[in-house]
A protein has these predicted regions:
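Substrate-binding pocket helix/loop in short-chain dehydrogenase/reductase
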Residues: 104-105, 112-114, 143, 212, ...
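Active-site helix of classical SDR
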Residues: 128, 163, 171
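C-terminal substrate-recognition "lid" of short-chain dehydrogenase/reductases
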Residues: 125-128, 140, 222-253, 258
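Short, flexible catalytic-loop segment of classical short-chain dehydrogenase/reductase
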Residues: 190-200, 204
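Alpha-helical segment proximal to the catalytic Tyr-Lys
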Residues: 133, 176-180, 244
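Active-site loop-to-helix junction immediately N-terminal to the catalytic Tyr of the SDR YXXXK motif
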Residues: 108, 154-162, 173
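The beta1-alpha1 cofactor-binding region of Rossmann-like NAD(H)/NADP(H)-dependent oxidoreductases
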Residues: 46-47, 67-78, 110, 230
Length: 259
């Protein structure tokens, strides 16, 4: 598949989305499928992916589910090769798998630091390295990484903020290395998005999900929190050829929160 075969959307492409069983990843998988892409729905537990795969197939789309620990080199390589074999290649990768283990520095364990780093940074590295083997020979590909506004620093998130800042550095570096092969690498940095992850954060600090969302909306210029679909649509744009001259960028999708 070469650039002349591509449209302005992800139609007719094969997309891998990690962390796709729920939240932003699930919305992204559904968005790609709605545009005609064949989607590999990856998450730690394959059974968790069944719901999204079922929705895609019920709508007439093509999707497969794969269980994969993105921090495990052998699992990542095997998963990417399986996608390429079953779906006919790999055109798009969305590195979205993530986890939080929030705490203040003096309370944060080395294990919680390592877990967050491994899932976010090691995972994005391993998945990107695996897909480039399929993208470089055909001189075409799109890699979109999920960063966060927390990359700018956030109390109680030394591990997460550092990992998300690292994602931005990885994005720029891969854009330099892979650009000569017509592979675009970009990142999105979501603000507060209403997901199970942010609901869990609310519970951890003793707030209801609704109260936490209301507080976040108050300090957001657009006066609302984001939905997973807000991010999915931006990811789909970056994966399409309308963004073919965009690479190495981090797009903040935060309702103006960073202003």
């Amino acid at each position: 598949m070469n650039t002349s075969e591509q449209g302005s959307s992800s139609m007719s492409r094969v997309a891998i989305v990690t962390g796709a069983a729920r939240g932003i990843g699930a919305a992204t998988a559904l968005q790609f499928a709605s545009e005609g892409a064949a989607v590999a729905v990856l998450d730690l537990d394959e059974s968790d992916c069944a719901g999204i795969v079922g929705r895609i197939r019920a709508a007439g789309g093509t999707a497969i589910a794969l269980g994969c620990d993105v921090a495990d080199e052998a699992q990542v390589d095997a998963a990417v090769d399986k996608v390429a074999a079953e779906l006919g290649g790999v055109d798009v990768l969305v590195n979205n798998a993530g986890v939080t283990r929030d705490n203040l520095l003096h309370k944060m364990s080395a294990g919680d630091w390592d877990l967050v780093m491994n899932v976010h940074l090691r995972g994005a590295f391993l998945c990107s390295r695996a897909v480039q083997r399929h993208m470089v020979p055909k001189r075409y590909g799109k890699i979109i990484n999920t960063s966060s506004v927390s990359a700018l620093g956030n109390r109680g998130q030394a591990n997460y903020a550092t990992a998300k800042a690292g994602i931005q550095g990885l994005t720029r570096t891969l854009a330099m290395e892979l650009g000569p092969f017509n592979i675009n690498v970009n990142a999105v940095a979501p603000g507060f998005i209403a997901t199970e992850m942010t609901d869990a954060t609310a519970a951890r600090i003793g707030l209801s999900a609704a109260d936490m969302q209301a507080k976040a909306a108050e300090i957001t210029p657009l006066r609302r929190v984001g939905q997973p679909e807000d991010i999915a649509r931006v990811v789909a744009f970056l994966a399409g050829d309308a963004a073919s001259f965009v690479t190495g960028q981090t797009l903040y999708v935060d309702g103006g929160r960073r202003l």
